[in-house]
Amino acid sequence: MKILFCSSEAFPFSKTGGLADMAYFLPKSINVLGHEIVVITPYYEGIKKHHETMTYLGTKTIYMGHGEVVVNYYKLVYESITYIFVQNMHYFEREGLYGYHDDAERFAAFSYAILESLDIIEFYPDILHINDWQTSMIPYLLDKHYRHQSFNYFRIHTLLTIHNLQYQGDFDKDVAKFFNTDFDYTYIHFDRVNYLKAGIERATKINTVSPTYSKEVMTREYGFSLDGSLQNRINDFSGILNGIDDQNTFNPKTDKYLIKTYSVSNHKSGKNLNKQFLLEHFGLDKNLDEPLIAYVGRLADQKGLGLMEYCLEEVIQYSNAKFILMGSGDKAYEDYFRYLTYKYPNKVGNYIGFNEKIAHIIYGASDIFMMPSRFEPCGLGQMIAMKYGSLPIVRETGGLKDSVIPYNKYTQEGTGFSFKNYDSYDLKEKLFEAINLYNEDKKTWQILVKQAMKSDFGLNQMARAYEELYKNIIGEKI
């Protein structure tokens, strides 16, 4: 099969979130399975440093709205995967990736540029794998402007992967002028243009990044007003759980960032050496027998920071647990965790921002990892934590529910702890349950740690699921 993977960001060249990681790991894994896959992504300002290693392929003029847009195409092969970069200085050579007043125009141009690229890059895919709102107009534009041009276009199928339904590409109606068509309700939602809705309406198949999230987004609670559109495509909609690179990037046996690497058999001594370093680094009490709770991620309401704010201080006051946080985001949450660190300097540490080395050490040192998300399409932090022997406390939503097996005190089954309701009391109860188990029943705790470390969230499992979906899509009639 031939797949053109269309992404508005791609690690290691550009990144704001998990989409960039998927644009790196999934193509590599699909390639290993023997399929041809090419990644196409914008040429952002930060990509200039790679320019000397690129090959210029050609230029296209795109007629969009009332003007012309000139784009250049560059090729770079990185770790055996071909990357195509779409260059337009006006649209993409800026400091950030998103959040500009002309995002609708920028990503309409990117979508056209992808469809115009096939003859220049000499790659005619069976499937255009599009991701999130930034490329969701592609199926519509393909149908309206390209299918009739040649068999190479006519035969193309499309797969839309929704990584987070909250972000939809919602714009004023005047951006419809970029599509070079008569007004069409395919992309209209509440009297506005909605890029993601167009993708949902027109893609051959749709998926999201966990089975549970695929069910949740068809409800009013999680559907962000597109639940009806998704329900209409229920037979073409599925969920595939994301994976992590647990062989190289997130492997405690080989992790170059850890103070001491370790495996399932010697995890206790290895984790203690990492904990010792981390406690010293943050200036906390050095008692290694006390549980260390951690959080690594965005400081946002979606991630359950509101629940943490309501209950964490009580946990710190009335238990022997210590807490370390790494992340950035909402300034109110940043200030709150600075306050906690100031008030409890021997028990709380924070790193406002991100540091790759320290993040890996936090996974390696911590005993308990918090992810009490309001909603979570997939989540990778809980998977990484389990591979490093840090037991996650999660809310039963999205990929958290699909990946964490809750502790059963009667059977000793489990790889973490979970609670159902979005309620700070429920989170507090689970925190105290985990802390008490850590303090009072070391044998059971070690059983859970070993079970967590043996969890399989590898990329091959994810790639096989996408391979099966690709095959299913190609069997569909256009």
Curated annotation (Swiss-Prot):
Catalytically driven reaction(s): [(1->4)-alpha-D-glucosyl](n) + ADP-alpha-D-glucose = [(1->4)-alpha-D-glucosyl](n+1) + ADP + H(+)
GO molecular function: alpha-1,4-glucan glucosyltransferase (ADP-glucose donor) activity; alpha-1,4-glucan glucosyltransferase (UDP-glucose donor) activity
Highest taxon above the source species: Bacteria
Pfam family, one: Glyco_transf_5
Enzyme Commission identifier(s): 2.4.1.21
Residues the entry annotates as binding ADP-alpha-D-glucose: K15
Alphabetical keyword list: Glycogen biosynthesis, Glycosyltransferase, Transferase
UniProt-listed GO biological process terms: glycogen biosynthetic process
SUPFAM superfamilies per record: UDP-Glycosyltransferase/glycogen phosphorylase (SSF53756)
Classification via PANTHER family: ALPHA AMYLASE DOMAIN-CONTAINING PROTEIN (PTHR45825:SF11), GRANULE-BOUND STARCH SYNTHASE 1, CHLOROPLASTIC/AMYLOPLASTIC (PTHR45825)
Protein family: Belongs to the glycosyltransferase 1 family. Bacterial/plant glycogen synthase subfamily.
Protein purpose: Synthesizes alpha-1,4-glucan chains using ADP-glucose.
The protein's name: Glycogen synthase
Organism: Acholeplasma laidlawii (strain PG-8A)
